[in-house]
C-alpha cells in the first residue's frame, strides 16, 4: 500500500480540483497509458487494486509504472459524533488526480494485452479514463 514515509502536517485542507493537469499528461516511461478524463481523489487502496488487476491479467509479463502517489491525507470523524470540536482524525491517503493525468503506464506487452489490462484497472478507479499511446497524449 502506498503511504508517505513522513509528512510535515498530518491534516490538510481539501483544496480545489479545477482545470486540467499542469504536468504528467504524457506517456513517458512505457508505450501505453491510462489517462484520466475527469478529476477525482484516488485512494491508496484503489491504486493498489488497479495495480493488482493489471499485473494478474498480464501474468507477470511487461512492466507497470504507477505515476500517481497518495500524498494527501483525508480526515473523518467517528460515526455518531456531533458537529464541531475540531477536525477529525486522519483516515487515509489520497492522490488528487486532475483530468489529463496519465496515471498508469505499461511496457513490454502488445497493444491488445495492454488495452485489456488497463480496461480492467479502470474499473477499480473512480475516474473516467481513456487508453493512450506514446506520442498521442
From Swiss-Prot:
InterPro entries: Ribosomal_uL16, Ribosomal_uL16_bact-type, Ribosomal_uL16_CS, Ribosomal_uL16_dom, Ribosomal_uL16_sf
GO biological process, one term: translation
Domain of life: Bacteria
GO MF annotation list: rRNA binding; structural constituent of ribosome; tRNA binding
PROSITE patterns: RIBOSOMAL_L16_1 (PS00586), RIBOSOMAL_L16_2 (PS00701)
Keyword tRNA-binding annotated: yes
GO cellular component: cytosolic large ribosomal subunit
RNA-binding found in the keyword field: yes
Keywords: Ribonucleoprotein, Ribosomal protein, RNA-binding, rRNA-binding, tRNA-binding
Signal peptide: none
Subunit structure as annotated in this protein's UniProt entry: Part of the 50S ribosomal subunit.
Family: Belongs to the universal ribosomal protein uL16 family.
Matches recorded under HAMAP family: Ribosomal_uL16
PANTHER family: 50S/60S RIBOSOMAL PROTEIN L16 (PTHR12220), LARGE RIBOSOMAL SUBUNIT PROTEIN UL16M (PTHR12220:SF13)
Record NCBIfam families: rplP_bact (TIGR01164)
General function of this protein: Binds 23S rRNA and is also seen to make contacts with the A and possibly P site tRNAs.
Protein name (Swiss-Prot/TrEMBL): Large ribosomal subunit protein uL16
Source organism per UniProt: Lactococcus lactis subsp. cremoris (strain MG1363)
Lineage summary: Bacteria, Bacillati, Bacillota, Bacilli, Lactobacillales
Gene: rplP
Amino acid at each position: 500500500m502506498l503511504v508517505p514515509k513522513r509528512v510535515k502536517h498530518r491534516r490538510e485542507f481539501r483544496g480545489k480540483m479545477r482545470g486540467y493537469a499542469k504536468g504528467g499528461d504524457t506517456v513517458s516511461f512505457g508505450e501505453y497509458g491510462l489517462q484520466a478524463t475527469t478529476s477525482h481523489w484516488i485512494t491508496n487502496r484503489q491504486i493498489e487494486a488497479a495495480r493488482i488487476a493489471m499485473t494478474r491479467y498480464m501474468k507477470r509479463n511487461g512492466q507497470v509504472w504507477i505515476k500517481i502517489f497518495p500524498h494527501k491525507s483525508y480526515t473523518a470523524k467517528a460515526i455518531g459524533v456531533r458537529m464541531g470540536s475540531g477536525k477529525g482524525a486522519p483516515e487515509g491517503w489520497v492522490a488528487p488526480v486532475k483530468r489529463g493525468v496519465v496515471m498508469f503506464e505499461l511496457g513490454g506487452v502488445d497493444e491488445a494485452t495492454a488495452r485489456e489490462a488497463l480496461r480492467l484497472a479502470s474499473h477499480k478507479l473512480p475516474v473516467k479514463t481513456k487508453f493512450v499511446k506514446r506520442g498521442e497524449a
